[in-house]
Amino acid sequence: CNTWLADNYSGLGIDDYSRIYLTSFDIDKHKKARRKNACFLYEKLSEIANFLFPIEKMDCPLFVPIVINKDRDSVHKRLIENEIFCPIHWSHPNANCKSNLYDTELSLVCDQRYDLNDMERIVDVLSKLLFEKV
């Protein structure tokens, strides 16, 4: 694999469009938006959600992984029906595994494309789903 990468990608540089985009990209603005969204999710869902990781001072999360203890796949489906996409990042491996994380993890997207109104909607819909029979 490394040999193939070295043979096919050596000496390639970034294209002009990407260089211009990256130099004009406001990294701090996006980091702040992500942290603000993630902290909002943690604050509003702290009573009803099991978070996999705490938010650390330097984190810039793309998503907040939570554990859904009731039928995660049904909750996931209902979120999609409400036009809220939450990826499942750790799907079942082919091998036998004793961890139930593969059946319970759901990622709440909180990147810079979203604002607090979007986060509030995620919280509202998810809260209703977790307290009803899915």
Task: Pin down the residues of each PLM region.
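PLP-dependent aminotransferase class I/II
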Residues: 1-134
